[in-house]
């Protein structure tokens, strides 16, 4: 009889320990269920790059004096500067300027040392292509104005992941009415239309 009672007591003890372990695991799960998802559903949601983000290089043809400082400071001598010497003006006439982003390491040396500030780093980071030759940007492609994430109505920009308030280290502490992960572009467009209609009524 005592042996049986001991077995029942041990079984009850083990059951309580198992229930406690399961409860702890479920507690962690439920805690995460209440939080806002941190996964960015790219390409429908995009992080806004930081202010000094080193993305695609923007080039202004009119400012360039063909000094080739960018070529000298580049670790891999990447920029290609084509120019001819004009004997009348005794200056260089720039013909073409190109950078191969397939080889560029985005170090920013060319931008930092450019004497006329004709080069600048943009926030654009989507340079993927099926053909590597398309990554060789000439002066026309480099002169194209950068595309901002915030200008695209089909994309939800996530500012709070890149710009958290001072002293704030937890991206979960954001308003619950912000668009959540998993929304499709058409849903976002409908949401924006409803918000615009509500603003017009007010």
UniProtKB/Swiss-Prot annotation:
InterPro entries: 4Fe4S_Fe-S-bd (IPR017896), 4Fe4S_Fe_S_CS (IPR017900), NADH_quinone_OxRdtase_chainI (IPR010226), NDHI (IPR004497). Residues 168-202 are annotated as: Disordered. It is an enzyme of class 7 (translocase). GO terms for cellular component: plasma membrane-derived thylakoid membrane. It is found in: Cellular thylakoid membrane. [4Fe-4S] cluster 2 binds at residues 74, 104, 107, 110. Gene3D superfamilies: 3.30.70.3270. [4Fe-4S] cluster 1 binds at residues 64, 67, 70, 114. It catalyses: a plastoquinone + NADH + (n+1) H(+)(in) = a plastoquinol + NAD(+) + n H(+)(out); a plastoquinone + NADPH + (n+1) H(+)(in) = a plastoquinol + NADP(+) + n H(+)(out). GO terms for biological process: photosynthesis, light reaction. It is a peripheral membrane protein. Its cofactor is [4Fe-4S] cluster. Binds 2 [4Fe-4S] clusters per subunit. Residues 55-84, 95-124 form the 4Fe-4S ferredoxin-type domain. Keywords: 4Fe-4S, Iron, Iron-sulfur, Membrane, Metal-binding, NAD, NADP, Plastoquinone, Quinone, Repeat, Thylakoid, Translocase. Coiled coil: none annotated. GO terms for molecular function: 4 iron, 4 sulfur cluster binding; iron ion binding; NADH dehydrogenase (ubiquinone) activity; quinone binding. Belongs to the complex I 23 kDa subunit family. NDH-1 shuttles electrons from an unknown electron donor, via FMN and iron-sulfur (Fe-S) centers, to quinones in the respiratory and/or the photosynthetic chain. The immediate electron acceptor for the enzyme in this species is believed to be plastoquinone. Couples the redox reaction to proton translocation, and thus conserves the redox energy in a proton gradient. This is NAD(P)H-quinone oxidoreductase subunit I.
